[in-house]
Amino acid sequence: MKSHIVITGGAGFVGSNLISYLLKKTKFKIVSIDNYSTGKKKNHLDSKRVKYIRGDTININKILRKYKNNINSLFHFGEFSRIYQSFKNFNKCFESNSIGSKEVFKFCLDNKIKLIYSATSATLGKKGKDKNLSPYAFTKSNN
């Protein structure tokens, strides 16, 4: 039986709350990957079942090499998630949300891992007519 769940963005608000829930409701071991651009170490939970790894999703294959045969599912929250800052940091936003997410999707596909992906309402805009108002929305809508 596969014994691990991976959460990208595990030191962020959504990821850390999901880790808390999974610790209470499951027996899985949890691997959190976060680059700490917005996530915080203060969100870490003290549990022997959680392993925190600093890293970027663009390197997910290397980061999870030793775990890949034991991963049941992967929750992908680890992306550049600031709309205003995406205008000033387009390259960083594109690298994380487009290239990093592609690497996560490929990793899951290649290793037959269930993927749970969190999108954003910013991709919809006004009935989809203005969905690309920010670099953030553009990169998310293309995933």
Predicted regions and their residues:
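N-terminal Rossmann-like NAD(P)+-binding domain of SDR-like oxidoreductases, especially those catalyzing
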Residues: M1-N143
